[in-house]
A protein has these predicted regions:
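Multi-pass membrane catalytic core of lipid/isoprenoid biosynthesis enzymes
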Residues: 79-120, 209-233
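Single conserved hydrophobic/aromatic residue that forms the stacking wall/gate
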Residues: 237-245
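Cytosolic, membrane-interface loops and tails of multi-pass inner-membrane proteins
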Residues: 69-87, 187-212
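Membrane-embedded alpha-helical segments that form the functional core of polytopic membrane enzymes
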Residues: 30-34, 38-69, 120-131, 171-181
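Interhelical loop and helix-boundary elements at the membrane-water interface
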Residues: 12-24, 84-95, 132-151, 204-216
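Functional transmembrane core segments of multi-pass inner-membrane proteins
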Residues: 42-43, 149-190, 194-195, 211-212
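Intramembrane alpha-helical segments
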Residues: 92-165
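Helix-coil boundary and interhelical linker segments in multi-pass alpha-helical membrane proteins
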Residues: 37-51, 107-118, 156-176, 230-236
């Protein structure tokens, strides 16, 4: 019985790892860490580590809730039909409960280890992605990724305001870079899985406007993203120059 319980726990953790979308979470951690390294702060490494962990936990919770809301659509798409919920490897109720627990404790934890502003922004980000984007935007407009991309762009801002109240324009530029990067990144996958999205009746940009126009828009967003990266570099350079004088 102990061996069976152990195997069940291991299997649950494996399925949980898939549910939290580790590729997405690693990006959240990386961008939040970049903001923390730039932010002027005298917070301890422990506080910074807890803040980063709680942001990752909140992102994990919203990813799980996203998969719970999308479980029916996922079962219709070749790319997603083997995910834990549609494949039956984890129950929908278990996934929902886990997502809610992760989301709740991340927001509450950030209130104690960060501040109320960061906690509220994290709660907004979770709701924006898991409810507004997943339940509404994704199914209503070809601009779903553009508008919904705000959720994925906010972690640097959350991380920054958790430990610092100075020079807020830096994390806003980081947010802008990720926001502009999201459409070309997501549309590349949408082009590759164009038929999959069409079969699931999801109005991705390539499905609604064709591949040629999508490629044109990808180039526009890429150009704007590069410009925003250069603006961050210029700000950092001028800031360093001012400090040296």
């Amino acid at each position: 019985e102990q061996n069976l319980f152990f195997l069940q726990v291991v299997n649950f953790l494996k399925q949980l790892y898939v549910l939290i979308k580790p590729g997405v979470i690693s990006l959240v951690i990386f961008t939040a860490l970049c903001a923390m390294l730039l932010a002027p702060s005298d917070k301890s490494l422990f506080i910074k580590g807890m803040t980063l962990t709680l942001i990752a936990m909140g992102a994990s919770g919203s990813a799980i809730l996203n998969m719970w809301f999308d479980r029916i659509i996922d079962s219709k798409m070749d790319r997603t039909k083997f995910r834990p919920i549609p494949s039956g490897n984890i129950s929908a109720n278990t996934a929902l409960g886990t997502g809610l627990i992760f989301s709740f404790f991340s927001v509450v934890g950030l209130f104690f280890f960060g501040n109320i502003k960061a906690s509220i922004l994290l709660a907004f980000t979770i709701l924006y992605y898991s409810v507004f984007y997943t339940m509404y935007l994704k199914h209503k407009t070809a601009q779903n990724i553009v508008i919904g991309g705000l959720a994925g762009a906010l972690p640097p801002v959350i991380a920054w305001i958790s430990i610092s109240s100075e020079q807020i324009f830096y994390p806003l530029i980081l947010c802008l870079i990720i926001f502009l990067w999201t459409p070309p990144h997501s549309w590349a996958l949408a082009i590759f899985r164009n038929q999959d999205y069409s079969d699931a009746d999801i109005p991705m940009y390539p499905v609604k406007h064709g591949i040629k126009k999508t490629l044109f828009m990808m180039n526009i967003y890429t150009f704007l993203m590069v410009a925003s990266v250069n603006s961050l570099y210029c700000l950092l350079y001028t800031s360093d120059a001012a400090d040296d004088t």
